[in-house]
Swiss-Prot record:
Protein name: Uncharacterized protein R06F6.12
Lineage of the organism: Eukaryota, Metazoa, Ecdysozoa, Nematoda, Chromadorea
Sequence ranges of Polar residues compositional bias: 235-245
Regions of compositional bias (Basic and acidic residues) in chain numbering: 31-41
Residue span of region Disordered: 1-41, 233-262
Source domain of life: Eukaryota
Length: 417
């Protein structure tokens, strides 16, 4: 009797265990087809979510990336550490990027390898950019140190350069920078021009570039100040690039007559010292109306008036004082007038006079204009002293008809060149 009561209770208990919703989520019925083996364990919820975020981020790539570049999210989402993956990173990781390649095809281990390669590449780029910025900042600081030294020297010295104005009334910036070159020289630059001091000149001045003092900086600036000023003045007259040589530039200014400075600037003069000896010095620039800045041969600078200097006298035969008459040019188009004048003079004077008439500097008659040469021949026909490279003759024995022999007196032997 008891056994009959217990039998119907067994199926009831089995049905209660199979009530839907009574088992935890994610638990499958105990069928053989739904059992996972050890190597087929399902991914964790976090891993699946991570893969979904990667796929979603890949679909929302920025438009400014190059073709084949990808951006993935590395680390926790709250830090938003984005990593850009390029085709080079994929190739370096050993993957062949083809058309239709998708990042979500990679496993988590493969994706970590690609992200690590990309991070290393970006770290190297950031390090290189940082090094370049440090070099640039160090160089600019080095230049500014010398710039401040120069300006402080000018402010402390009342004899320094005063403010200058251009034609428009604007103040000319006289700030200078000292730049040390790799060959041991110095580049002194201003807003207008630059001046180079060679290592030999620095050695003559006994300047140690590794330990520049305020006095050394002042010497370098004073050495470069006149050339820089002259180049700035010359650029206002013409648009041509001035020569980098100071003496050549000074010679061009004297010949062109455009220089407004004192004629003795740049000249080597003699200065009488306190002990009565004469020393050679180079005039650098004029200060005020009568005081000149000079540099002695030992590199020292001083001020002197025109009365204290012995200026060498120029000979009138110098090139800058010579006045050469412009050359007379003769073209073939003037041949007719020359022949007519020659025929008129030949009717009156048949012989070349012993005392030559006023000589005219005429070039040989050719197609184009040429410079004048020194006359070397007196023509008995036109009484002119001219230059001829080769002698020319009048042909007097030429077979001709009777009419031509009576009408023609002379025939010019002209060579066509």
């Amino acid at each position: 009797m008891d056994s009959e009561k217990e039998n119907p209770a067994s199926p009831t208990t089995g049905r209660e265990e199979e009530i839907p919703g009574s088992s935890p989520e994610g638990v499958y019925p105990a069928d053989e087809d739904h059992i996972f083996h050890e190597d087929q364990a399902p991914l964790r919820v976090e891993s699946a979510k991570h893969e979904e975020e990667i796929v979603e981020q890949q679909q929302q790539q920025p438009e400014d990336l190059e073709q084949g570049d990808m951006i993935v999210e590395d680390g926790d989402q709250q830090f938003m550490n984005m990593v850009q993956i390029t085709q080079e990173d994929m190739y370096e990781a050993g993957f062949d990027v083809e058309a239709g390649f998708e990042l979500n095809h990679l496993t988590e281990e493969q994706l970590n390898i690609v992200v690590a390669i990309s991070q290393q590449r970006q770290a190297k780029q950031n390090e290189q950019e940082h090094n370049e910025e440090v070099v640039i900042e160090d160089g600019s600081h080095h230049h500014m140190v010398h710039h401040e030294m120069i300006e402080n020297q000018f402010e402390g010295d009342g004899n320094g350069p005063e403010e200058e104005y251009d034609g428009n009334g604007q103040i000319i910036d006289n700030a200078m920078h000292i730049i040390l070159t790799n060959d041991g020289g110095v580049n002194i630059t201003s807003k207008q021009k630059q001046f180079y001091v060679s290592p030999s000149e620095i050695a003559n001045l006994n300047i140690d570039l590794n330990n520049l003092s305020t006095e050394n900086v002042h010497q370098l600036v004073q050495l470069a100040l006149p050339p820089i000023k002259e180049k700035a003045q010359d650029s206002a007259y013409n648009d041509q690039a001035p020569s980098t040589s100071y003496h050549h530039h000074h010679h061009e200014q004297l010949e062109a007559g455009k220089s407004t400075r004192s004629p003795i600037i740049g000249e080597t003069v003699q200065i009488r010292t306190a002990d009565g000896r004469l020393q050679d010095a180079v005039v650098k620039y004029v200060r005020g109306d009568s005081e000149y800045k000079i540099q002695l041969m030992n590199g020292e600078f001083a001020y002197a008036t025109i009365d204290q200097m012995l200026v060498p006298q120029r000979d009138r035969s110098d090139h800058e004082y010579q006045q050469v008459a412009p050359p007379v040019l003769l073209r073939r188009t003037d041949m007719a007038s020359v022949r007519n004048a020659a025929q008129k003079r030949s009717a009156n004077d048949d012989l070349c006079p012993p005392v030559l008439k006023k000589s005219y500097q005429l070039a040989p008659v050719v197609d184009g204009p040429h410079l004048v040469h020194t006359p070397n021949f007196c023509c008995p026909i036109c009484d002119k002293k001219v230059y001829q490279k080769e002698p020319s003759y009048i042909v007097i024995r030429l077979p001709a008809c009777d009419s031509c022999t009576r009408e023609k007196i002379i025939v010019l032997d002209e060579q066509s060149s």
